[in-house]
Curated annotation (Swiss-Prot):
Localization annotation: Cytoplasm, Cytosol
Organism name: Sus scrofa
Co-factor requirement: Mg(2+); Mn(2+)
Major location (coarse): cytoplasm
Lineage, uppermost ranks: Eukaryota, Metazoa, Chordata, Craniata, Vertebrata
Catalytic activity: D-threo-isocitrate + NADP(+) = 2-oxoglutarate + CO2 + NADPH
Name of the protein in question: Isocitrate dehydrogenase [NADP] cytoplasmic
Assembly: Homodimer.
Sample GO molecular function, one term: isocitrate dehydrogenase (NADP+) activity
Length: 13
């Protein structure tokens, strides 16, 4: 879901 994508982007950072 969106939360998962947000976490993924934050994880990249």
């Amino acid at each position: 879901d969106l939360a998962g994508e947000i976490h993924g982007l934050s994880n990249v950072k």
